[in-house]
């Protein structure tokens, strides 16, 4: 099954980078972002592909930096922010970098200019966002996976979406 996109639809991709990575890793596949962008540029009227990720700023080398730079130079709009470091109640060092608010704000802001949004995330926290965007007349498709354990695509998000591609390998894998 593929996502149904009409030729006249204005479309945008919203990629929750951490969630997509977490879905792909246990399934042992690498995401071909060039192919992914190419697929959607050929369908509908492609407006933008946004990729959301937090970056560890204080490290000499960040393992995600080469990907971020490649995406930035190859057609994606990068939305990043620095991670925050804190110590939990057990004295363990933790790093936090949630991009959900940034993604939600951008989606709400762009929704009036789009016909179809493709959300690459299985995060159930986005269910209400999807509902509100749909009320604005925008179709929302979700790409994630139910093949992982536990499934990365939350049930409530799958139920809310207009279309679900729960076997993300068909769209994003090499």
Name each model feature, range by range:
Residues 1-99, 124, 139, 145-149:
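Domain-level signal for Mg2+-assisted phosphodiester chemistry and nucleotide/NA-binding surfaces
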Residues 53, 121, 168:
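Residues that line or immediately flank small-molecule/substrate-binding pockets and catalytic motifs
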Residues 96-98, 102, 121, 158:
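Residue-level recognition of hydrophobic positions within alpha-helical transmembrane segments
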Residues 101-117:
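Conserved interaction-surface patches within small, structured recognition/assembly domains
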Residues 104-108, 151-174:
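Structural recognition of alpha->loop->beta junctions
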Residues 112-155, 159:
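Active-site histidine-anchored catalytic micro-motif
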């Amino acid at each position: 099954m593929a996502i149904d996109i009409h030729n006249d639809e204005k479309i945008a991709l919203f990629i929750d980078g951490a969630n997509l990575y977490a879905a792909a890793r246990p399934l042992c596949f690498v995401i071909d972002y060039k192919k992914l962008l190419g697929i959607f540029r050929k369908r509908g009227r492609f407006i933008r592909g946004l990729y959301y990720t937090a970056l560890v700023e204080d490290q000499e080398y960040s393992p995600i930096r080469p990907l971020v730079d490649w995406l930035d130079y190859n057609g994606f709009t990068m939305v990043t922010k620095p991670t925050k470091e804190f110590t939990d109640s057990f004295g363990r060092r933790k790093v936090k970098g949630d991009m959900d608010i940034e993604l939600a704000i951008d989606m709400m802001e762009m929704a009036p200019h789009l016909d179809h949004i493709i959300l690459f995330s299985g995060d159930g926290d986005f269910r209400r966002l999807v509902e509100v965007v749909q009320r604005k007349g925008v179709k929302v498709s979700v790409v994630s996976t139910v093949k992982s354990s536990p499934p990365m695509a939350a049930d409530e998000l799958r139920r809310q979406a207009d279309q679900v591609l729960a076997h993300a390998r068909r769209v994003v894998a090499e």
